[in-house]
């Protein structure tokens, strides 16, 4: 189970959906698309 776009996340334990190119923003602490 991974976190979708805009979901709150923990930068030190990034559980955002890698298959959707999502990463946890250290600044905003939510899943965003990796550029």
From Swiss-Prot:
Protein name according to UniProt: Mu-theraphotoxin-Hhn1a
Domain notes: The presence of a 'disulfide through disulfide knot' structurally defines this protein as a knottin.
CC annotations in GO: extracellular region; host cell presynaptic membrane
Pfam families named in the record: Toxin_12
Compartments in which it is found: Secreted
Subunit structure, as described in the record: Monomer.
Organism: Cyriopagopus hainanus
Entry keyword annotation includes Secreted: yes
Miscellaneous comment in the UniProt entry for this protein: IC(50) is 42.3 nM on rat neurons.
Assigned protein family: Belongs to the neurotoxin 10 (Hwtx-1) family. 22 (Htx-4) subfamily.
Keywords on record: Disulfide bond, Ion channel impairing toxin, Knottin, Neurotoxin, Presynaptic neurotoxin, Secreted, Toxin, Voltage-gated sodium channel impairing toxin
